[in-house]
């Protein structure tokens, strides 16, 4: 699927400075009238589970080998990126199943609180400990019934559907929608969106129009009267801070039919029926996940972490997809190699491949695999990251465009475009990196 990342906090980065910067002892006691800085507790950033710290650095971004077919010069650019945390492996079926199960169980608990299914209000929290009303949300401390009554059983049954032909009873994946909200800090910080017109420019030669109408674009999603999901991009005059809060409703179940639809005239029914559902594939990378689903997973993962850390935690850097520059910087390793490994060959001295890809025309098994492989069976790169080439391609947050690296900044570069529902398909394309098990060497 992809790897998530967490940005290193600025303070944690400052704590690691050494070498050319030397060391400086903080003053214990300041003299009267002197600026000595505020005191504070030392901070050590804990390592997020399953993630590797990638220190800040420089890379030449872009293809090292020029286009051999057309002889066109491929752009390269020197860029610098700040430090961040990155998952050491691709997201597995097991990890993504946890997300799907969370969505399923939240829907079930909400339904058990519905009068149509017994109306047990203890499955929802509607007020705080002081008795003040809050936005209704699921009470996860309330266990699901082990011996459901008739109404509760109907709630359970409502999440499943039966194939009228085969009689198979399966989860109704169409119901597995996850709703989340993301505050756009970047848009909110832009001067052109300041609520006070006087703050929109520092140029005193510019005459401020206090009646200027500033338009803002935001995403929203809701259920209509028929229970259908409606997704819209709204353009309206800026009115307040809520204009920077975007709402999404995303169906989270992966497209298991990709095994059939992406491979014409191939016998892949086994993977269609088993790859995501069978525990034997738990440690394999999840596939069939859209860019929207990948972002929803990151949002859920952030929310899940916050709930696990408890109410004393006010803020953490949220999980997100890496930018294309961050991904490439991490994949190249500490020595910024052409490949995630240390040489230009695809096999080691013993003839073993460094990654899971398509070694030869029609020959998928030459590297020991037919389809995807379990994560982390190949050696990691020098950053401690597995499968940065091959196995499955990975989503980034960066827009795919022909301008590519030339259009990016040389400082924490990326290209972002929040495509509206009605935008043409070409504006919705995102960059994927790393190649996959079905791609030739040139794609990795």
Annotate the PLM regions.
Residues 1-4:
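Positively charged n-region of N-terminal signal peptides that target proteins for export
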Residues 7-14:
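Sec-dependent N-terminal signal peptides
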Residues 17-19:
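C-terminal motif of bacterial Sec signal peptides marking the signal peptidase cleavage site
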Residues 24-31, 53-54, 60, 65, ...:
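Functional-site microenvironments in short loops/helix caps that host divalent-cation chemistry
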Residues 24-44:
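N-terminal pre-domain segments of enzymes
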Residues 43-119, 132-133, 137-140, 144-278, ...:
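A short glycine-rich, aromatic-capped structural motif
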Residues 116-126, 347-351:
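Charge-dense polyanion-binding interfaces
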């Amino acid at each position: 699927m992809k790897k998530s990342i967490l940005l290193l906090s600025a303070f944690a980065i400052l704590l690691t400075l050494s070498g050319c910067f030397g060391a400086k002892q903080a003053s214990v006691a300041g003299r009267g009238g002197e600026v000595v800085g505020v005191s504070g507790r030392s901070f050590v950033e804990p390592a997020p589970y399953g993630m590797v710290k990638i220190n800040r650095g420089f890379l030449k971004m872009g293809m090292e080998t020029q286009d051999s077919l057309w002889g066109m010069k491929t752009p390269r650019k020197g860029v610098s990126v700040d430090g961040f945390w990155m998952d050491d492996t691709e997201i597995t079926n097991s990890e993504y199943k946890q997300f799907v199960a969370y969505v399923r169980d939240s829907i079930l608990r909400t339904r058990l609180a519905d009068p149509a299914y017994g109306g047990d209000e203890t499955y929802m929290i509607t007020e705080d400990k002081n008795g003040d009303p809050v936005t209704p949300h699921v009470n996860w401390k309330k266990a699901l019934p082990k011996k459901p009554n008739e109404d509760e059983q109907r709630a359970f049954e409502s999440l499943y559907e039966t194939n009228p032909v085969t009689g198979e009873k399966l989860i109704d994946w169409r119901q597995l929608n996850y709703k989340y909200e993301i505050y756009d800090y970047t848009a909110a910080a832009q001067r052109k969106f300041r609520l006070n017109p006087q703050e929109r420019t520092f140029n005193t030669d510019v005459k401020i129009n206090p009646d200027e109408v500033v338009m803002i674009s935001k995403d929203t999603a809701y259920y209509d009267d028929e229970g259908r999901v409606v997704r819209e991009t709204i353009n309206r005059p800026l009115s307040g801070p809520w204009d920077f809060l975007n709402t999404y409703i995303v169906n989270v179940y992966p497209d298991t039919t990709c095994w059939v639809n992406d491979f014409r005239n191939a016998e892949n029914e086994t993977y269609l029926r088993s790859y995501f559902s069978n525990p034997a594939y738990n440690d394999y990378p999840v596939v069939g996940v859209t860019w929207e689903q990948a972002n929803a997973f990151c949002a859920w993962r952030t929310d899940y972490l916050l709930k696990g850390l408890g109410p004393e935690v006010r803020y953490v850097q949220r999980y997100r997809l890496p930018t294309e520059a961050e991904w490439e910087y991490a994949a190249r390793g500490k020595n910024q190699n052409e490949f995630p490994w240390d040489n230009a060959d695809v096999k080691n001295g013993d003839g073993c491949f460094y990654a899971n890809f398509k070694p030869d025309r029609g020959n998928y098994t030459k590297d020991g695999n037919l389809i995807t492989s379990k994560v982390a069976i190949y050696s990691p790169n020098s950053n401690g990251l597995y499968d940065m080439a091959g196995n499955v391609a990975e989503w980034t947050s960066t827009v795919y465009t022909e301008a590519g690296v030339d259009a990016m900044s040389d400082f924490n570069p990326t290209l972002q475009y929040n495509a509206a529902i009605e935008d043409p398909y070409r504006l919705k394309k995102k960059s994927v990196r790393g190649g996959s098990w079905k791609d030739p060497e040139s794609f990795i």
